[in-house]
C-alpha cells in the first residue's frame, strides 16, 4: 500500500557530496529521504551516522551500473510511495590524475557509470516522478572546460537545441571507440575522460528537460544539471576549496525549488546561478 508521503532520493550517497545532500534534505525536505549506495554495509553505516545527528533517512541499495538494481529501486518507490518527488543523481566515479590505468580503459569505465548509469536511472525513474517533481543531475564545471576543449564541430553538436538522446549516446560511444584506437585527440576530443562523461550528463539533462516540456509540461517538473564546485572528497582530494556541505548547497537548492517555480529548467547551474552552456 503506497503512502502519499513525499519522498526524495539521492544516489551515491554513503559519503562525500551525496552524503551531505542527504543530510541537508533530511533537515529541509518535508517527507522521507532515501539514501542509496552500491555497498549495503556502507549505506547502513551512513544512515547510522545520520541517526546519531537526530536525522532519519531510509536506505535502499542501488548500483547504477546494474539495471536489475535500478528496477528493484523503482519497484520499491512505486510500492511504498506511488512514485518519486525528488531525484538527485549524484553517483559517479573518476580516476586519479596519477592513475596508471590506460586512457581507453578509463574512458570506458568512467562512461559506463557516469553517463550510461545515470541515463539508466533516468529511464526507470523519470516516468515515476510526480507532478511538481525536481530532478538534479550532478555534473561538473569540468564538463564546461572539456566542452571548450572539443573541436568546433563537437561543440556545435553538444550545444545543439535539437540533439537527440540517440545522437548523444552515439557520440559517447564514439569517444570510447576513438580512445581505444588512440585517435581521440585527432577526432577533436579533450584529454579528460571524466570531462567527456560529464558533458554527456549535462547534455542529457538538456534533452530530458526538453522531453518533459513536450510530454508533461502541465506537471511543472524541473530538471537541471549542476556543478557542486571543487569539493574535498575522496574523488577530488584534500586540497579542494569547498567542504561537502558547501558542495551540497546548489544540488539541494535545485532539489527544493518551490512549487510553482518556472525555472531554472534544462540549465547548467553553479553556485545557484545559471551558467551559459
Curated annotation (Swiss-Prot):
Annotated positions binding substrate: 140
Cellular compartment(s): Cytoplasm
Matches recorded under Pfam families: adh_short
Modified residues (Phosphoserine): 2
Binding site for glutathione: 95-97, 106, 193-194
Cited Gene3D superfamilies: NAD(P)-binding Rossmann-like Domain (3.40.50.720)
Post-translational modification N6-1-carboxyethyl lysine, affected residues: 239
Entry annotated with the keyword Acetylation: yes
Keywords: Acetylation, Cytoplasm, Lipid metabolism, NADP, Oxidoreductase, Phosphoprotein
GO BP, sorted A to Z: epithelial cell differentiation; glucocorticoid metabolic process; ovulation from ovarian follicle; phylloquinone catabolic process; positive regulation of reactive oxygen species metabolic process; prostaglandin catabolic process; response to estradiol; response to gonadotropin
Catalytic residues of the enzyme: 194
GO molecular function: 15-hydroxyprostaglandin dehydrogenase (NADP+) activity; 15-hydroxyprostaglandin-D dehydrogenase (NADP+) activity; carbonyl reductase (NADPH) activity; oxidoreductase activity, acting on NAD(P)H, quinone or similar compound as acceptor; oxidoreductase activity, acting on the CH-OH group of donors, NAD or NADP as acceptor; prostaglandin E2 9-reductase activity; S-nitrosoglutathione reductase (NADPH) activity
Region (Disordered): 258-277
UniProt KW Phosphoprotein keyword: yes
Listed EC numbers: 1.1.1.184, 1.1.1.196, 1.1.1.197, 1.1.1.71
Residues that hold NADP(+) according to the record: 10-34, 63-64, 90, 194-198, 231-233
A GO term from the CC aspect: microvillus
Broad class of the protein's primary localization: cytoplasm
Catalysed reaction equations from the record: a secondary alcohol + NADP(+) = a ketone + NADPH + H(+); prostaglandin F2alpha + NADP(+) = prostaglandin E2 + NADPH + H(+); prostaglandin E1 + NADP(+) = 15-oxoprostaglandin E1 + NADPH + H(+); menadione + NADPH + H(+) = menadiol + NADP(+)
Class in the EC hierarchy, top level: oxidoreductase
Annotated function: NADPH-dependent reductase with broad substrate specificity. Catalyzes the reduction of a wide variety of carbonyl compounds including quinones, prostaglandins, menadione, plus various xenobiotics. Catalyzes the reduction of the antitumor anthracyclines doxorubicin and daunorubicin to the cardiotoxic compounds doxorubicinol and daunorubicinol. Can convert prostaglandin E to prostaglandin F2-alpha. Can bind glutathione, which explains its higher affinity for glutathione-conjugated substrates. Catalyzes the reduction of S-nitrosoglutathione.
Quaternary structure and interacting proteins, as annotated: Monomer.
Entry similarity comment: Belongs to the short-chain dehydrogenases/reductases (SDR) family.
Name recorded for this polypeptide: Carbonyl reductase [NADPH] 1
Organism listed in the record: Rattus norvegicus (Rat)
Amino acid at each position: 500500500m503506497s503512502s502519499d508521503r513525499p519522498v526524495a532520493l539521492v544516489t551515491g550517497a554513503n559519503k562525500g557530496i551525496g552524503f551531505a545532500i542527504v543530510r541537508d534534505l533530511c533537515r529541509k525536505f518535508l517527507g522521507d529521504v532515501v539514501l542509496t549506495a552500491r555497498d549495503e554495509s556502507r549505506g547502513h553505516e551512513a544512515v547510522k551516522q545520520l541517526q546519531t545527528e537526530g536525522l532519519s533517512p531510509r536506505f535502499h541499495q542501488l548500483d547504477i551500473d546494474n539495471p536489475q538494481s535500478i528496477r528493484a529501486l523503482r519497484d520499491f518507490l512505486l510500492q511504498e510511495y506511488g512514485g518519486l518527488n525528488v531525484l538527485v543523481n549524484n553517483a559517479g566515479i573518476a580516476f586519479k590524475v596519477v592513475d596508471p590505468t590506460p586512457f581507453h580503459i578509463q574512458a570506458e569505465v568512467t562512461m559506463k557509470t557516469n553517463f550510461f548509469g545515470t541515463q539508466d536511472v533516468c529511464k526507470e525513474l523519470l516516468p515515476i516522478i510526480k507532478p511538481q517533481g525536481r530532478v538534479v543531475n550532478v555534473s561538473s564545471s569540468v564538463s564546461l572546460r572539456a566542452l571548450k576543449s572539443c573541436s568546433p564541430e563537437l561543440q556545435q553538436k553538444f550545444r545543439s537545441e535539437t540533439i537527440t538522446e540517440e545522437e548523444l549516446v552515439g557520440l559517447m560511444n564514439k569517444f570510447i571507440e576513438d580512445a581505444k584506437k588512440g585517435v581521440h585527440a585527432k577526432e577533436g576530443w579533450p584529454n579528460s575522460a571524466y570531462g567527456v562523461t560529464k558533458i554527456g550528463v549535462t547534455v542529457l539533462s538538456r534533452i530530458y528537460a526538453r522531453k518533459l516540456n513536450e510530454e508533461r509540461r502541465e506537471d511543472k517538473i524541473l530538471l537541471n544539471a549542476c556543478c557542486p564546485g571543487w569539493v574535498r572528497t575522496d574523488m577530488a582530494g584534500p586540497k579542494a576549496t569547498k567542504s561537502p556541505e558547501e558542495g551540497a548547497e546548489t544540488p539541494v537548492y535545485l532539489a527544493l525549488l518551490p512549487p510553482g517555480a518556472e525555472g531554472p529548467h534544462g540549465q547548467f547551474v553553479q553556485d545557484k546561478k545559471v551558467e551559459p552552456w
